[in-house]
């Protein structure tokens, strides 16, 4: 996004007059007038390509192909210590001016699982499975993002209300077992013989008390005590293996009355804007794919990206029409600059949401670990006429590259240094935020997590621009709540002008600097 200021030659409406050409397939130099190799121009907008806002749903029937992601907690974690990024952003001071009350933030992601610490969660629809409401998170990603934006604090004193949570779904690729027929035979008749009680012993009159048992033997060696539950119990670990957990306190044979309900243990975690409402829209999932094999002419991976671009465009329009004044898109798509697919609908959608509906759209810069997300050049001092290196772009990230309407966020560490091997640079990066030391709400229970299940019974530490975008979305919500009279354009302008700038003033890794909620 270009830096907004007095005298700028760019405005949000300046690109909306003509139909896009750059968004049509750019494969193999097919676009007339496009410089050779990887050189591209900023995208243009065709408002007439706006997709309709119908009931959310996938473009084709889908099915679950993989098991849902499990989550965990890293050894030695102390959630009573505030995450480093919260200290870096000085949120306690920022909250003196408000906590985002009254602002709706749409999270277009993998869905958000209900949690007691997300009390204002609104179902926004599902573009992965027909009939869904957006409140299922198989990938354990959208819930993390939403909680970093909006999780309420827990002081441990007041019990949080329980919330319904759907069971974790399983893949539908396995053949169901054949039906079984069970034949029930009648129970054969039984003969019961009643034996009369023996007569009383001689010398004992009828009705006299029966002699008691003999006294116990004298004290001596005692037999082993009865096992009341001590020992060990086998429980599943995060990746489906087994581990042994010791049980130190055996069950009490005489339990007392239950203790009054208590809240969760106090911790230092909170979302950036705990007063906001979250609209959850599930637009993507790595665990789901087409129900029927793809039979078109395009490469299946290209066809999948085309569908993802279309559903993302529809999700943005739907979020804007639901009243979201901030739209967070952490799950972005990368593609080669030599093969940019048609994005007219997506361009029209971000223009509609930002200009017509006055929503602040925040998107991640993209992570190098994702498919097709190869790093872009940072800056070429030999090209002073191209300070943001548009002519050197090798990877396009969408919708992030619609820089006139989308605030794109790069990732830094807790010291403010760019995550250069992870965060995808680009001329559209406008701001940055911490992307490490991630803590969030669990999509599987009422607790906190800071890890996800990895291979070979390992835990993976989440990090990257997805969570940097969540932080900036939270800060944007704080500013919207404090200054409701400001437009989305003015909110973005304020955020990039108050960011902590890099040495050059702006660069393709961190944009105009690290977001500052109290500036």
Q: Which residues does each predicted region cover?
A:
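Substrate-binding/access-modulating region of protease and related hydrolase catalytic domains
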Residues: 204, 287-398, 458-463, 467
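Solvent-exposed loop/turn segments at secondary-structure junctions
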Residues: 110-114, 127-129, 154-155, 284-288, ...
